[in-house]
Amino acid sequence: MRLFASSGQAATSPALAHSSSDEAGEVIENSHTKRAGCSVLQSSGGKSRSLERYSGAPKIHQQTLEMLPPYATPTCSTRRRLLAPFRSLKRRSRSSSSSNESHHFGNHLNNLVVVNVGAAAANGGVAKAKAKASSQSGDSGTGGTELEHEMEQDDDEEDEEEGEEMDELSLSYSQLSSSGCEEAEAPPEDVPDDRQAAVEATVSACVQHVANERRRNILSLYSSSSEEQLHCRLGDITLVDDTYSNYDPQNDAERMFLQVVGILRDENEKMRQFQKILEDLSSRVALAEQTKTSWLPPSSVGEANEQMQQLQRLRDKMTTASALLDDCNEQQSFFTANQVLVPTPCLSKLEDLNTRMKLLQIAMDERQKVLCQAGAQQTHENGDDGRTTSNSGTIGPLPNLGQSVKPPWERATTAANVPYYIDHERETTHWDHPEMIELMKGLADLNEIRFSAYRTAMKLRSVQKRLALDRISMSTACESFDRHGLRAQNDKLIDIPDMTTVLHSLYVTIDKIDLTLMLDLAINWILNVYDSQRTGQIRVLSFKVGLVLLCKGHLEEKYRYLFRLVADTDRRADQRRLGLLLHDCIQVPRQLGEVAAFGGSNIEPSVRSCLEQAGISQEAIDGNQDISIELQHFLGWLQHEPQSLVWLPVLHRLAAAEAAKHQAKCNICKEYPIVGFRYRCLKCFNFDMCQKCFFFGRNAKNHKLTHPMHEYCTTTTSTEDVRDFTRALKNKFKSRKYFKKHPRVGYLPVQSVLEGDALESPAPSPQHTTHQLQNDMHSRLEMYASRLAQVEYGGTGSNSTPDSDDEHQLIAQYCQALPGTSNGSAPKSPVQVMAAMDAEQREELEAIIRDLEEENANLQAEYQQLCSKEQSGMPEDSNGMQHSSSSMTGLSGQGEQGQDMMAEAKLLRQHKGRLEARMQILEDHNRQLEAQLQRLRQLLDEPNGGGSSATSSGLPSAPGSALNSKPNTLQTRSVTASQLNTDSPAKMNQQNGHYEHNSKNSSGLVTVITEQELESINDDLEDSSSSNTTNTTTTTTTTATTEKTCVELQK
């Protein structure tokens, strides 16, 4: 790479061919002398690559200075900093280059003098001209002393020897240059004065002519150079080519020289990027100004809403432009701090852009006020209650969320910005908004729905409508996530203010909503699902998943987006990422108390099922290898509607069926037309049911729950009618045993009893850890206490069914209690599961039985004591009537003994009541164990260890062809009512509408038992004793039966 002061090196005349670089150096050096007193680095093309000095440039006119570009005017300090490493290099190269330069310049002037003077000049004149040329050559040889003095002044600590050496070098340059000219031709001694004056004038005119020609050539080079050629200049140095790009330095000076060249390149690249950003920013601002000129006053509310949306989009664009402008201002400050000269046009453009951006911001604010006034005026004319009815006034600052509640309620926030609500009338505080409490209480009415999948879908649909999330498209939500910088931030945390900002940008796109109330309810719902501990922060992944699941969009598009959230750069997801996604999805039904019907809270079985469906071997899964799946594998698994996520496609079908009208009459409630789901029996001819009758499990005379049915969410076609008639005809010839032997399940069951180690908790940081279940004994105590309370108060839920405590809930509870070790000792097979449960349950039962036997022994001993006392207190003498005094004493003694006996009998009856309550618990527990054992027997009898386990989980079943079809929201499903899950939801707190999870403690069992109502005090003591003996015998028999069954199963 060469360092020149101009980008051209060719001269316009042959006389300038060998000195174009020198001419450029003279002109630029002259301009630097006028402006900042700086010099220029140059290297001649035909000479060595060492750094050479320039001779002093002649003075030029001020107009010539103004014609030069501004890049050629750096500060003196910048030039000194760049030239400082080359002092030693300059000293070594000075002696080798100065003589050649002076000799060429002398010959050049000699030729010019001969051509102009001609024959009229005498020998003396020629000699005088040569002497003049020698003098000029000496000046040229000793020129650049200005550069030397400047460098010597920068280094005041140099010794005097270096100064003397430089003087000697300068003197040798002058002598060598002068001697070079004298060797050509010696001047004659005698020359007339008039001729000498004429020759001097001629030579002066020639020199001035040459200087002018050189200046014109340099200026023509600048004028002919394009902006692209000139913008590469940095200060007084121009990067012309890459001569030194591959040069291998031979000494320290050359290495320092190349380092400076690299610094110049970096500065040049920064300047080019700076100019490029300015050009881009200028085009953005110009486009925004063009949009501003097209603004018109709104003529209607609809037009005002549309213009407000356009204004919001313009604001989003200008946000990016403002960020670019801030970067430019920071870069300009960096250049100034490092004494890098920024071109004047760039500074002017930057200042102009700052001014235009401020004017645009003011114009957008004024425009927003105009649109807000138009929306408010229309609202006043419509006579509304003061709430926002359109999004025309919602863009801008966030609304005051304190206005979302009305007296006597008050909204307050914690230190972590978590909202809570104060009821001044009852003097209570709640985490939930009053509207959310009413919503959750209203969901309790849906507990009458018999089947879990439809019950969960109905609840989610109610929440979706109340929060207006069904009016927000998934594309809008994704754009809002990206616009607020949430892309690729899924492992980080988001606080409540940021969530409110994102939700605000979503709700402003909806008309006729109470924006403040919707924001508060949405925040409340998200915190209930993902932050029940109210820490004030959730993961960004959870926030996105919670909104995408309930927003409007196609089902397959949601599946694809959810997979992209957890996929890596190779578009693959491993076990951990997949577990995080499924964990966040399962929290939605868990909040509604419906998680037991979908495989429980543990997501490991679902992950295992997905990997197996993708074709990954069981050995690879158990070996904790580095395995991952692609999008097609994930979609293929979801196409089968897995048990943990089956509620999501049911929700989509429910939303699609809301407006569907079927030209058929319900054979049970006689509704016509059927609105919503339509269920057609595939065994009974011309038998239809509406969704209400089907959900609540109603039945007709000839129709039974075991009959297969087909579900329609859209209007049927003639082809479907013919197909259903053919199916009904075929099913007429099939027996009941056939349907029991071939159950048709339309979802992919999750084998909870086969689960292995629990996956790691989805906790990205110590600040936010997911609550993990403690010892499962706590949940068992809660279950026992709730059942004992039901027995005590004599009431059970109206929505309970005989199968409400079936194997799904039990399997989930037992599997959660299994030790999750990392050494591979976790039970994987039904036999291991049974062995683990047997060891735990046997200890509990034996401990309870020992307590009961000990209490029974104490009661028997007390009973024998009472009997002996009663017998000993009776009179032994038959003639006791003869002694009246002794008779009276005996009667009084018997009366005291009777009172003691009554008191002890009362205590015994109370103890009997407690024993009976405990025995009821043991009997219930025994029935659960028997059901579990029966279930495990079925799993062992099957050849592949699964398949029929889904017959009791009960979600909509589907034909086999639907499993291979493309997932579709509006697909029809085959349903058998007897195969549907009838699990009851979790108990809801009637005070605040929450579904309780592990909200009780072990003391609740003791409290309920001590408050158990007792039987009548008139029962005699013998009945109490006999009942206790019978209860103990029943307990022993139950335990023996359980142990015997366990032994048989293990065999």
UniProtKB/Swiss-Prot annotation:
Biased composition (Low complexity): 129-139, 169-179, 1024-1042
UniProt-annotated binding residues for Zn(2+) 2: C681, C684, H703, H707
A GO cellular component annotation in the UniProt record: cell junction
Domain of life: Eukaryota
Organs and tissues of expression: Expressed predominantly in all body wall muscle fibers during embryogenesis and in third instar larvae. Expression is also seen in the embryonic and larval ventral midline and larval brain.
SMART domains: WW, ZnF_ZZ
Topological category with respect to the lipid bilayer: Peripheral membrane protein
Disordered: annotated segments: 1-53, 85-106, 129-191, 376-406, 870-898, 941-1051
Lineage: Eukaryota, Metazoa, Ecdysozoa, Arthropoda, Hexapoda
Function: Specifically required for survival and integrity of the larval musculature: the maintenance of appropriate synaptic retrograde communication and the stabilization of muscle cell architecture or physiology. May play a role in anchoring the cytoskeleton to the plasma membrane.
Ranges of compositional bias, category Acidic residues: 149-168, 182-191, 1012-1023
Annotated WW domain residues: 403-436
UniProt KW keywords: Actin-binding, Calcium, Cell membrane, Cytoplasm, Cytoskeleton, Membrane, Metal-binding, Phosphoprotein, Zinc, Zinc-finger
Amino acid composition bias (Polar residues), ranges on this chain: 1-12, 879-891, 962-993
InterPro entries according to UniProt: EF-hand-dom_pair, EF-hand_dom_typ1, EF-hand_dom_typ2, KCMF1/Dystrophin, WW_dom, WW_dom_sf, Znf_ZZ, Znf_ZZ_sf
Biased composition (Basic residues): 85-94
Modified residues (Phosphoserine): S761
GO biological process: actin cytoskeleton organization; establishment of cell polarity; imaginal disc-derived wing vein morphogenesis; imaginal disc-derived wing vein specification; maintenance of presynaptic active zone structure; muscle cell cellular homeostasis; muscle cell development; muscle organ development
Subcellular localization: Cell membrane, Sarcolemma; Cytoplasm, Cytoskeleton
Free-text disruption phenotype from the record: Flies exhibit muscle degeneration and lethality. Flies that have reduced expression of all isoforms (due to transgenic RNA interference targeting the common C-terminal region) exhibit severe muscle degeneration in larvae and adult flies. Muscles were either ruptured, absent or the fibers were detached from their attachment sites at tendon cells. These are necrotic, not apoptotic processes.
Chief localisation class: membrane
Subunit details: Component of the dystrophin associated protein complex (DAPC). Interacts with Dg, via the Dg WW domain binding sites.
Protein name: Dystrophin, isoform E
Species assigned in the record: Drosophila melanogaster
Chain residues that bind Zn(2+) 1: C666, C669, C690, C693
Zinc finger (ZZ-type): 661-717
GO molecular function, one term: WW domain binding
